[in-house]
Amino acid sequence: MTQTEKHALWAQEEQSAEMHGWDFSHIRGRVVEAPLPWDYKQKVLDFLKPQSVILDMGTGGGEFLLSLRHPFSQTSVTESWQPNFELCEKKLAPLGITVRKTEEDKPLPFADNSFDLVLNRHDSYDVNEVRRVLKPGGYFITQQVGGSNNLRLRALLGNNKTAMPSFNLENELLHFKNAGFTVNFCDQALSLIHI
């Protein structure tokens, strides 16, 4: 199969895939990712207490959040992508979870010192806004995709440009430390994806 034929096939696949939240079940069994050296869910569970008031930033459709089985009345989510926001309003709000829409470069729509724990898996964030909404002694747990991730995949798709080349662990650590955070754990992995 030529590169042009592959691109056409991938474009067709993209059009046929129905996305609801961050449910990627349509590619299950067709993509192999190297495991990460940490377990994000376990990291969250290590800090999540029954009385914790939590925020899940960029929750998608709440798939991960719901797997935590945390009391809904102590849970808030944000979502910026309109289809996912609408899904959250239909799926999460009726459960009693607070759902808020966010916009890039705007303050988080919550009062200062609102949360014991802020979660963020692959969503953008402003370190100072996270600090503002955390209660004193609160925790921010994040897992991000850095600017150097998937370079081979980008090249395969014909896009060799990195959108955010300076977004990496080293630079983000400086931002967190400058904002007054204490970093309890950090690691990075540049994993390979096989399609």
Predicted features along the sequence, with ranges:
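Short alpha-helix
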Residues: 165-180
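Conserved small/polar residues in nucleotide/adenosyl-binding loops
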Residues: 193-195
